[in-house]
């Protein structure tokens, strides 16, 4: 596998708003939300995918709690933050992401960053960067690598660390076994496949099986890089979704409640795509009359949510929210609110949709029709 820029290269360092002007896609650096199906809260990341987290109640729209910059487990249970108020020590805190309460706090000598976490939240990766080397800590195990490595993700048991190896001629993906300390190249299911692109968004399955990353190719085409976190084998899923870097970077990636389906929704490119994760192939493409690509808002990333039964998908763009019927492949007419949308989430009943606005009170829509409630 050659010339892949993985998702966590974009997420290792929290991006300030000024980074958006330097070419960071809205999905990685803009304000966006996630809402596990059936959850009572919506998570809004206000400074990129490793930025501060705000949790909102899906029934009232009220903010429940706020957490500092850190990493959130895919199942929505655990949040780990790191801060170095002193140059010589780092304070680390593990939170229950469902309540915002502290589970544990501790400190380490040196300056460490929390950069990855397993889907269950059981294990997390810490890195300490030096001029010539990078130190890793995962579940009590340590390793030291040249400074040309970045962390991409973790296997469910925390034994393997998936890495990006930077070279003068580009970069490749490798994996480190923390027990044997063996470093090997990440294998591709098709050895002859060559993928070139830049990561613009990613999502991990809540069962710890897949890390699914959307890549933008230099020619405007795109593909999904599906990394099996259990076996370490990578797969490529070619897409018919085409557009420039920022348009593709406004694609929302959402998983079905049973983790068997990945939905890609992009109102700027006018597409909703369905991928069967069992077959690793696109099974449906639906068109919609969406927004102009000239109006991509780099400060506001894409948000999406599914009802607990997986029937309705809500996705956003600027001030508009659309509802997609996953059973019939129908996109409902978009509903507009007064200001930019920063998050969406369905109530556990699946009958109402909470819409969070950047400037303004929360709105509630009927989950079937999109009408205001």
Annotated model-derived regions:
Residues 6-16:
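Bacterial N-terminal signal peptides
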Residues 21-65, 72, 76-77:
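An edge-strand/N-cap motif at the start of beta-rich repeat modules
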Residues 26-35, 66-77, 109-120, 147-157, ...:
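Repeated scaffold domains used in trafficking and secretory/extracellular systems
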Residues 38-40, 76-77, 122-123, 157-159, ...:
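Short coil/turn segments that connect the beta-strands within blades of beta-propeller domains
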Residues 41-43, 79-80, 125-126, 162, ...:
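Structural core positions within WD40/WD-like beta-propeller blades
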Residues 47-50, 84-89, 130-133, 166-170, ...:
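Short glycine/acidic-enriched loop and turn motifs that connect beta-strands
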Residues 58-61, 96-100, 137-141, 177-181, ...:
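Short loop/turn segments that connect beta-strands within beta-propeller blades
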Residues 64-69, 103-108, 142-149, 183-190, ...:
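Beta-propeller fold detector
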């Amino acid at each position: 596998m050659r010339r892949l820029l993985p998702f966590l290269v974009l997420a290792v360092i929290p991006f300030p708003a000024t980074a958006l002007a330097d070419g960071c896609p809205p999905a990685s650096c803009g304000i966006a939300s996630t809402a596990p199906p059936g959850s009572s809260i919506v998570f809004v990341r206000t400074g990129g995918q490793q930025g501060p987290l705000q949790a909102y109640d899906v029934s009232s729209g009220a903010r429940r709690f706020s957490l500092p910059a850190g990493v959130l487990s895919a199942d929505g249970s655990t949040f780990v933050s790191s801060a170095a108020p002193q140059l010589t020590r780092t304070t680390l805190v593990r939170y229950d992401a469902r309540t915002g309460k502290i589970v544990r706090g501790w400190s380490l000598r040196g300056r460490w960053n929390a950069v990855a976490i397993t889907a269950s939240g059981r294990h997390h990766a810490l890195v300490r960067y030096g001029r010539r080397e990078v130190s890793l800590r995962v579940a009590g195990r340590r390793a030291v690598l040249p400074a040309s490595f970045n962390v991409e993700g973790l296997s469910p048991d925390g034994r393997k660390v998936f890495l990006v190896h930077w070279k003068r001629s580009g970069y490749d993906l490798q994996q480190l076994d923390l027990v044997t300390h063996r470093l090997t190249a990440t294998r591709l299911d098709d050895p002859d496949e060559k993928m070139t692109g830049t990561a613009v968004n990613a999502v991990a399955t809540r069962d710890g099986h897949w890390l699914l990353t959307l890549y933008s190719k230099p020619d405007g085409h795109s593909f999904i890089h599906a990394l099996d976190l259990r076996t370490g084998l990578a797969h490529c899923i070619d897409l018919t979704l085409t557009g420039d870097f920022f348009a593709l970077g406004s694609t929302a990636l959402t998983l079905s409640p049973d983790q068997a389906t990945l939905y890609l929704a992009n109102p700027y490119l006018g597409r909703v795509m369905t991928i069967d994760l069992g077959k690793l192939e696109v099974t449906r493409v639906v068109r919609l009359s969406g927004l102009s690509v000239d109006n991509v808002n780099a400060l506001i990333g894409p948000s999406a949510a599914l009802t607990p039964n997986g029937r309705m998908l809500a996705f956003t763009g600027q001030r508009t929210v659309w509802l997609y019927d996953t059973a019939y492949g129908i996109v409902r007419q978009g509903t507009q609110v007064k200001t930019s949308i920063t998050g969406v989430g369905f109530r556990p009943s699946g009958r109402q949709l909470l819409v969070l606005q950047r400037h303004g009170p929360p709105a509630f829509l009927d989950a079937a029709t999109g009408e205001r409630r």
